[in-house]
Amino acid sequence: MEVNCLTLKDLISPRQPRLDFAVEDGENAQKENIFVDRSRMAPKTPIKNEPIDLSKQKKFTPERNPITPVKFVDRQQAEPWTPTANLKMLISAASPDIRDREKKKGLFRPIENKDDAFTDSLQLDVVGDSAVDEFEKQRPSRKQKSLGLLCQKFLARYPSYPLSTEKTTISLDEVAVSLGVERRRIYDIVNVLESLHLVSRVAKNQYGWHGRHSLPKTLRNLQRLGEEQKYEEQMAYLQQKELDLIDYKFGERKKDGDPDSQEQQLLDFSEPDCPSSSANSRKDKSLRIMSQKFVMLFLVSKTKIVTLDVAAKILIEESQDAPDHSKFKTKVRRLYDIANVLTSLALIKKVHVTEERGRKPAFKWIGPVDFSSSDEELVDVSASVLPELKRETYGQIQVCAKQKLARHGSFNTVQASERIQRKVNSEPSSPYREEQGSGGYSLEIGSLAAVYRQKIEDNSQGKAFASKRVVPPSSSLDPVAPFPVLSVDPEYCVNPLAHPVFSVAQTDLQAFSMQNGLNGQVDVSLASAASAVESLKPALLAGQPLVYVPSASLFMLYGSLQEGPASGSGSERDDRSSEAPATVELSSAPSAQKRLCEERKPQEEDEPATKRQSREYEDGPLSLVMPKKPSDSTDLASPKTMGNRASIPLKDIHVNGQLPAAEEISGKATANSLVSSEWGNPSRNTDVEKPSKENESTKEPSLLQYLCVQSPAGLNGFNVLLSGSQTPPTVGPSSGQLPSFSVPCMVLPSPPLGPFPVLYSPAMPGPVSSTLGALPNTGPVNFSLPGLGSIAQLLVGPTAVVNPKSSTLPSADPQLQSQPSLNLSPVMSRSHSVVQQPESPVYVGHPVSVVKLHQSPVPVTPKSIQRTHRETFFKTPGSLGDPVLKRRERNQSRNTSSAQRRLEIPSGGAD
């Protein structure tokens, strides 16, 4: 009974706390929960049979131990979802080598573990995985198998610059066996090397090794082809398109209009008519062609950095269809293969470009950049490898690309030059017509200085080539107009001659010894002679002080007759000849220097002197201003923009005159060789301009003669060494005919001048013949200059070129010792690029052509130099007059002050 009562109490007691829990639920839930747990634990305490089950479970734990690795196996099954683990699983399942190794290990493992045969498939699987791991340790890593490392091993087998006599044949089978790779891995390397002409295909799987000998030529050709295919503009277009897309996403529309409407007008380079994306033929899709195009992108890029996505969009046919996107990715991997080989060749290196959307893989060109197009024979890449270029497509690209250039950020300098030109034209002076294309020349030539300098160096290494009738020196490099002489107004009446006049090979300097001085003299008698000049038809106006020779070059040596040998500085002359298309003027007034630099002033005002000086050493065109002033003209310096390049006495030139002709031919003299002991004297070079003008007005008789000769790029420049040998009375013109004076002159002609009309006399009488004791019996050559307003002719014959072994000349005029300095205009020193003159045999007795010379009665005002042959955007009455009438009116107003002459706007009759 008691037991039953206890049992009933025990049955009732749990219900009571549950009722209590139901009642007191809202008051203290946590306490009730604890109380309920305790009450529940209380009746379960007598039932203690369950711990026995727990002990049984503990006893079975050793049996369940083999199950725990199964859980790890289950965890490992989640890993193959990653690409790397999935690749490992595929390799282990598919590779026959791995299966063979597993079979061999499985055959011997049961024999070794007979007693443990119970360790069934689970343990065998674990051991198999460890075997795969061991095999993976033995296998090379991905880095060891990389194409770049494989290419390095491949290149290490062959010399970079093999001997011309040694012929190396590459067998792809042998290379694949020696490097331990499949032959298909070698194909990628060989295709890229073949695109750069490092190897050439001989037979099937046989290639010949050439090395890097022809690599610069190949790269130069690839650069030219890349420029023809407009890759630079395509890259600029794609980059701008990305920027426009980013701006569009951020809601930043361009101020100049909707970018979408503009992009429709521009070229879509993904169209199939574009040659870069027209990868229709199988040949265009080959790795070799893609490699060449990839290299072109680097060669035409300004930054030499090409991002991979831009390269892929240009080089790979990117279709808008979704199924072709995988093909696009596959071809991007091919670009990586090309880049790996080029990296092994040390031509590019991998960099990362940080943009708005994050880092992008890119490659930077670290190979040679020291080449440009030249006239020497190049390897024809397009004929051997590249597909033919579609000319009609280029025209379509060029039209749209020109629209793009105006709004691309890198071409803002063109707009700047237009603004500066407008400032220059709006100054208070009469505008004249100027040559088409010369408006932005003064700025554009600065950016092209390196290209021109390299072209001159390349031309100098080629053959000596003949004079050309029409000279487009810069047309092969840039659409800029051919080198203008200077920007001169119609007062100079510069009109191109129809024929070349002089051409002198630099090796003709060897015809005489610089140490022996001049061996021939030319008499300058001021007689009017205009008979045979008409054959040249230069259309020159009367009274012009310039002769414009647009073709070949001229070498003149004005000797100092009392200083012994008139030996000009070889290095100085070499710099004259090395300054590419040169403009030479014989000038006396410093106002001429100011005129010459007037156009350069607007952009030079804000530049420091050092930067301006360095830029002037790079730019062209050039001008040698050689005064015939008396000794006090040393006080006359150039404008302040000339720096310390203003004056150099001819005595310093003669000091350096003992350089041999071979050193002149070498062309290695730099611009520093022009610097003499007096250049470093800033006190002489920084004289103000007002004293110059005062001296100019006080010294009317010592006026100037101009001889302006322009030579095309690569030909001999105009070489003049003028001694201090003219006094003002002998040079200064008057209203009547000028008095005669003697100038020792040597002109060495070049053989190409045969077909041109010449005036030749074996013995011309001249007033200098009595003084020329060292001349041969043939006699001197007449050198006639006009009176004012008349036309004269320069008669140069072979008698001016005499035996170099003859003695030095005596003094023809003891007064010809007064010229002390050589003033270089700032335009002259624009380009000191050194050129190696082409060697040619010495033709001493070859006749030369006729030059028209004119004498200016007045050194024109500083503002008178304006450009010619283009209508400016506004007209004043001064732009309508006859140049001769305007010049004569300026003769009458000669004595006015410089400030008045600067603001003077002369008027004349209508044309």
Curated annotation (Swiss-Prot):
InterPro entries: E2F (IPR015633), E2F_WHTH_DNA-bd_dom (IPR003316), WH-like_DNA-bd_sf (IPR036388), WH_DNA-bd_sf (IPR036390). Induction: By p53/TP53 following DNA damage: expression is directly activated by p53/TP53 (at protein level). It is found in: Nucleus. Keywords: Activator, Cell cycle, DNA damage, DNA-binding, Nucleus, Phosphoprotein, Repressor, Transcription, Transcription regulation. GO terms for cellular component: chromatin; nuclear speck; nucleoplasm; RNA polymerase II transcription regulator complex. Residues 595-618, 686-699 have a biased composition (Basic and acidic residues). It holds the Pfam family E2F_TDP. The modification Phosphoserine is found at residues 95, 410, 840. Residues 254-283, 418-438, 563-645, 672-701, 860-911 are annotated as: Disordered. SMART domains: E2F_TDP. Residues 142-211, 282-367 bind DNA. Residues 672-685 have a biased composition (Polar residues). The keyword Magnesium does not apply. One of its GO terms (biological process) is negative regulation of transcription by RNA polymerase II. GO terms for molecular function: cis-regulatory region sequence-specific DNA binding; DNA-binding transcription factor activity; DNA-binding transcription factor activity, RNA polymerase II-specific; DNA-binding transcription repressor activity; DNA-binding transcription repressor activity, RNA polymerase II-specific; identical protein binding; RNA polymerase II cis-regulatory region sequence-specific DNA binding; sequence-specific double-stranded DNA binding. Belongs to the E2F/DP family. Atypical E2F transcription factor that participates in various processes such as angiogenesis, polyploidization of specialized cells and DNA damage response. Mainly acts as a transcription repressor that binds DNA independently of DP proteins and specifically recognizes the E2 recognition site 5'-TTTC[CG]CGC-3'. Directly represses transcription of classical E2F transcription factors such as E2F1. Acts as a regulator of S-phase by recognizing and binding the E2-related site 5'-TTCCCGCC-3' and mediating repression of G1/S-regulated genes. Homodimer and heterodimer: mainly forms homodimers and, to a lesser extent, heterodimers with E2F8. Dimerization is important for DNA-binding. Interacts with HIF1A. Interacts with MN1. In contrast to classical members of the E2F transcription factor, atypical members contain 2 DNA-binding domains and regulate transcription in a DP-independent manner. Both DNA-binding domains are required for DNA-binding and are proposed to form an intramolecular structure that is similar to the winged helix structure of the E2F-DP heterodimer. This is Transcription factor E2F7. It comes from Homo sapiens. The gene is E2F7.
